[in-house]
């Protein structure tokens, strides 16, 4: 009830404060110059933009002293622009198609004559935006319905955008969550995708704020935009932003149903001899996939109240290639049950409605609610099914929004809006009745392969990741200026518990126990965040030049409430006071861009943009500083199972070596010591402490002929202000270097047998002594260093997944002809350098510290087409040629192998020596970004047939064919050097992606409209 009251209070506050636009950061517009027959500018001309997409029917402006006009905040749609002035004939421009975020240059040439005389001009829609500098891809609902898009999702933007990476998918077979999740997406080396609905952030509040729980229903999408650069000061995005522009209904009732279906019999087997040689017994198989949307829209009251509603039922079930259930579950052994293949199953139920109400001539209210339940059984990761994220029940969850738009005059516009994204992500221990897992089953990791079985590493009964967002803005528009200022505010709630079966995990090496991990579970952490941003910007047209400039002031604040924990097996009862300002960061972020209409005809534009963007953050930064987490929640100790009973025969509460167990590797474990891990107070507050990136772009856009345009560009980004972790109890002098000889293997460089040096082990006297401080990285930089990244931070967030320096080039073409033919695509390539060559604690940090991702690893070719055929047939398709993933060889070297070079046993051994010590160290046998899998080529096709059932009822029959060539490209392999090295496995780092491209898939679909 407390959250409900808060939600209602915030909604009321927003409505009383001001008003909000549906277009937000992707506002469209029409602008231009009005002239007379002699070429002189005409002030005082009334310019009206009319469209069925506007519930108010028409928006207007008046040209200024330079003859310029500017109509902003228009919805996507088809417009008629009318120019009228006493003493001149009225001029109409018809068929102006606006996409989201596009400003169409529509100039008016007026002749002397009677006002009643109307001259109608029908011409091609402008394709070059000479006003804006943002780099964006706009995908309309019409285009998605035309192309082979499977279960329509955010992944479709990745398929159509050269340079964008994401989850490989064949007709929706990768699942509902992964095709809608932004976590795996990057663009030109940048990660941290912000997903917005109607201009408001809807991602979960936990972690770095880059994951989703709520799944947008694409039936509501009029258009979806992807901004990849040149983003204005209005946006708090970290460099990449997706925004769904929702449908509103209209003055005509429309009803319909969209559906698709496929089954196991329609999915081809693509198992090849090459895959069998890699140890693959079977590839992934779609058992069923369905998606049904029932939609309705129209007027509740014509010209006043519109509605649009959609009810979605969708689901999928797939086998996971090469993986089986455990026939000996509940024992220390994994025995593949060849009669039970691992599977992944998901289903979603969603019911949503949007209402748009023209309150008065100047005020418009929009309300949206979508309540859904999303369910998951199995993840498809490289783990035994019993140890995967087994039973996600994301219910109830949903998205609830309200916005108000107030056009005070043809120059003044007020906007405001509010959103409540309810994201839940619990994955509880499933119990003995589900997938045969008992709470007594201990999670086991086989170190030689990286394979986990018997139980999940950790479980969560509570994962609340709620996000509340608000925004407001004021726009003042003249013919030459579009001034806008306002703010966005977000509040995040993240409650998450942690449970571990038996409060321990086991690690085996080739079936022999060698490590036990202890946890202070169960516990519940509470984290909170607030993100506020204020901006001011202007778009200034000076003859052919348009300047876009603005400034943002961002303030990110995280805190945790008071928390109490009961005593657990390995920890005493603890109480912690509330902690504020962890961190409290302020930043000033300039944005600048310029667009020059080279010939003054709106057909060629030269563009430049530069901006400072902040790392994406969520409540995870509060979690880092939460005193519960800072007290050390888990620690490792070696384990020599001398009696072979697969149970650690030692006193685990004794942190010193005893029985079969060595000493704990962190002496803070189990103690009430919130200072064991902490942030340097100097970087927790103030200006400019947050990691940021600069992003610049130069582009040339040219309309080759009516209906065809091309873009060529150069793009560069780099990040700065890194954080790093310093264990203040040790120095580089406390480490001893060693080398390891690589195994002899023809698959290794030179056949193996070479030495890998640069490894280091801490002195035994310092083992377990930890006092970690997260601090600025730059004091550790050597003179003349070229550091572009560190191990803990990057513009994508706290994990440094996308930091460094990137240079990219892009050439793309887009066309749409009056005949209905559409063609598009492009080539994108680039190079990324990540340099982390500095030492904080261990000299080993210099090993492979400079990584270059070459052009060949980032060159993409993408294209799409759509051709109307006779008899209401249509043929369309997409093609992608993408680079293969990189892979490495991480070798778990034993103490015996290491001691030869180290001159002693590893520090983790304690009093054990030689083979009696089961400690290991991971040795990288291959330098990152030097070995790659084969490139992937994927062709998807669609054939449609329009059928007129009655005068009002139409059916479109759809036949889709995905992965036409039945390619079996390997997408990810095991990078742990051992018996399973280079075997195709799911990429667990991004939630498990199919290791092999699924085979040819046939889908049947239909769209019914009346």
Functional labels for PLM-detected ranges:
Residues 969-1010:
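C-terminal beta-signal and terminal closure region of outer-membrane beta-barrel proteins
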Residues 556, 711-888:
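Gram-negative outer-membrane beta-barrel transporters
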Residues 662-669, 673, 677, 779, ...:
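Extracytoplasmic gating/loop element in the C-terminal half of outer-membrane beta-barrel translocons
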Residues 154, 167, 179, 562-589, ...:
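Solvent-exposed loop/turn elements at secondary-structure boundaries
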